[in-house]
Amino acid sequence: MSFVLGIDTSNYTTSCALLDTADMRVRSCKKLLPVKQGERGLRQSDAVFHHTKQLPELMKQLFDKKYDISAVGYSYAPRCAEGSYMPCFLVGENVAQAVSLACGADLEKTSHQVGHILAALYSCGKLDML
């Protein structure tokens, strides 16, 4: 039985999930980035800081035991478009690369936007549409 780890570090939420490839069940952990009262968002440097603190905490919750990780997926940018870049995605990318190297797992990247589409397909049981 193997598992796929997914990591997303957007400008709003730190997220990680484990997909059990045997039964396609998902366990996930996520935490909103803290935005001060009256503000509308975060500077990228603040988002990077919060992801750096939150992602290890979430991974600790997710990994309640040792898992055979066969692949690691992560979001590298907001969209699959030339010039689409936000520093906050580097946190997830770096953790994904480290886990992939440590586990000898395949490494796959996608955009945050594609992640939303894949989550919708998974949620409605339509992964066969891929």
Residue spans of the language-model regions?
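Short acidic/glycine-rich loops and adjacent helix/strand connectors
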Residues: M1-L130
